[in-house]
Amino acid sequence: MRLSPRKDKYYMNNEVVRVLVTSPLGVGGVTNMMIHIQEHLDKSKINFDYLVFHDRHEPMEDKVLSLGSKKYVASADNVKFRPFRRIWRINEIRKVCKRNHIKILHYNADCAADMTNIIGAKLGGVQYITIHSHNAGFGAAGNGIRFISKILKPLIPLFCNNFYGCSELAARFLFPRSIIESGRCSVLPNGIDLEKYDYNEAVRREIRKKLNLEGKYVVGHAGRFSDQKNHSFLLDIFQAVHRKNPNTVLLLFGVGELQEAMKNKARTLGIEDAVIFYGASNEMNKMWQAMDVFVMPSLHEGLPVTGVEAQASGLPCVFSDAITKEVGLTSNTEFLSLQEKPDVWAEHVLKYMNVQRKSERKILEQAGYDIQQTADTFAQLYLNVAEKL
């Protein structure tokens, strides 16, 4: 879809270019990435606003407001019949975009069913839409989502102008073959602030003392408590780890609908005293330092930002083989089958007990994961787009 080369009042008189970003404002990988990008933008020229789909206060809301963002809500929470919520939200998004004269949208997508939201934005007058794939599978999604995605996937090139995938796998999952084969899609690494996440022994001692982890072998994980992240299997793995070495702790960051169920399972497995359900943290760069190994047995991922953050902090990482191997950036990463028993996983988790942590900053810089590179890509794209609208 070509943009007509005209000027719009919205971008005249040296106004700041506003890009509307879809992202929940909880503590999650994509949200953290967008905020890190925003922190590295020249906000006298370009800034982000956020579109959320639930009318509630969220952990990172105050942070984005302090960066000069506006928060827009397009909620269907009051619609009791779930199948109607997606239809209702189309109109809510249309109204938000029309009322606020939104011209540019950066849509962080999980699957092609998200096209209903993009259609709402288009109906609201949005002229330029980037769709950014962050997922590589449906996981536990119902047949309804799969069916809607199959129907709407061919419409993506009709409504969107720019196509990003956080990995090649994520791009192939979301976009039609025509987009992939024509070369219109780009892989954009999930950049992070490498200096902020770099291994720091002093911070490690500080956080381990604060959390009473001194002398412990800390198995860490960060992710929303949802089916996709596979916390149930993670607890099984840790039970095996703890049985082999009682001087171990499982440190979990995140919130979500399955959190209470996982607390109950930890009690059932008899490991509740060795599992810390920390909840959300806006200081994950420090929290990574306290861990000794990162374990991620997800059922599917695009390219997990948390996996990049963990490696940037010098952590060994054990991923499931359902995660793209593109995330394996450092030498201390491995991928295990979800069909393997927890005891096998436990052996791999424990083998890193004597690994000496070190900075991995140069390796991640060379791989393109410096947040400033990502921010520069965003700025160049949207400043050029704004000139043509």
Task: Please give the residue ranges for each predicted region.
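N-terminal strand-loop element at the rim of the active site
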Residues: P5-Y11, L20-G28, N32-W88, E257, ...
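Acidic anion/phosphate-binding donor-loop and adjacent secondary structure
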Residues: R82-F84, R172-I179, G183-R184, P189-K210, ...
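Aromatic "clamp/platform" in nucleotide-sugar-dependent glycosyltransferases that forms part
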Residues: D110, A280, L299
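Short hydrophobic beta-strand element within catalytic cores of glycosyltransferases
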Residues: P316-S320, K325
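A charged, aromatic-enriched C-terminal amphipathic alpha-helix characteristic of glycosyltransferases
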Residues: Q356-L389
